[in-house]
């Protein structure tokens, strides 16, 4: 009986200690948050509100308003900060203390990043080297001609669907478009926009995005650490599918590379990391850099273009404005090219407005290398920080009439708006300009050839579904040829 009493006392003591640890402020400016329960932390509130169909990003948004834009949340043993206070975000833009990724702190991200490698998850000099290599390669190997040719191939692949009056399901076709362009840049390999490989990669990336967006007990409790690899090998199967493709390309490039004539990103990376002197660790870094590019180049582009098409269908009057602008810009040309972009600012603004309201969620996590005061808030070392881009985008102090879909807000130079579509600061996506060009070509050529309509004449469901980015439900539309 005494042993039972002692065990009961120790359990109660642990619960009290854990409760105090999670709720006690360690600094007068420590961020506040909802009551964190022992062991589970704020998982209790997340699961409770899910019963009432309130999604995680909605709940965090509500807390953001209550706690002045910086929400402290304990997910199991991990301390998270969700930041939508733009004054605090500005510190993240310019301060090197916030350049670091917490990939070794969250097991799911650790697995997806090969233990903190790549351009997304590495830090310090390794990250700077990776980013520099990718940025330079993008400038050399991403040509206007390549993007324009792939956009034409994408549009031409829809001819059969239109002629047969079939329903067009954008997501799969956009995945093919994005993968096809990426394969040429990354591996100098021609891949049809309709190829099975494109769909396989697109589905794998979507699988990874979806599963990384939801933290599991394995992410939040150290006690499960012996089972991390076993669990995430099964949960994140999409990672292994993409990695196998990249590894095969790496081996093939080593056999055929001419250092004096690099063909693509893989060649550039092999040369950068020493070619014949490449170690196993270098190979892992090269492959992870390529893996990291698949995410935004395929996943983010697909999600965003999918949203843009949905918004164009739901707003036929704005679709007509975009079409008339494009038609005027191209004149007698059969297809839209990047030379037309300067005369088609509205469609670029439409893409940015869609990203503002629909596709930007929490982005990728970062962490503080050291404790730091950021304005009215104390940011502790090793806290896992997510910038809540969706909440920032709906802040009336930053965006006038923030909840209104209004692309023209990006056309008025007297009213500058924050450029947060691809992250902030030095950690912003190095391929963001290529991504905009890719989406511009795909969407504008689609509009030039077809009027986009919902299947039944009613608005398409635009409910947001939480992921690494915020995605729309799968939907189909009608393609009506323009005369």
Curated annotation (Swiss-Prot):
Its EC number is 1.14.-.-. It is found in: Membrane. InterPro entries: Cyt_P450, Cyt_P450_CS, Cyt_P450_E_grp-I, Cyt_P450_sf. Disulfide bonds: none annotated. Pfam families: p450. One of its GO terms (cellular component) is membrane. It is an enzyme of class 1 (oxidoreductase). It is a single-pass membrane protein. The chain crosses the membrane at residues 1-21. Gene3D superfamilies: Cytochrome P450. Its main location: membrane. Coiled coil: none annotated. Its cofactor is heme. One of its GO terms (molecular function) is heme binding. Heme binds at residue 429. Keywords: Heme, Iron, Membrane, Metal-binding, Monooxygenase, Oxidoreductase, Transmembrane, Transmembrane helix. The keyword Iron applies. Belongs to the cytochrome P450 family. This is Probable cytochrome P450 517A4. It comes from Dictyostelium discoideum (Social amoeba). The gene is cyp517A4.
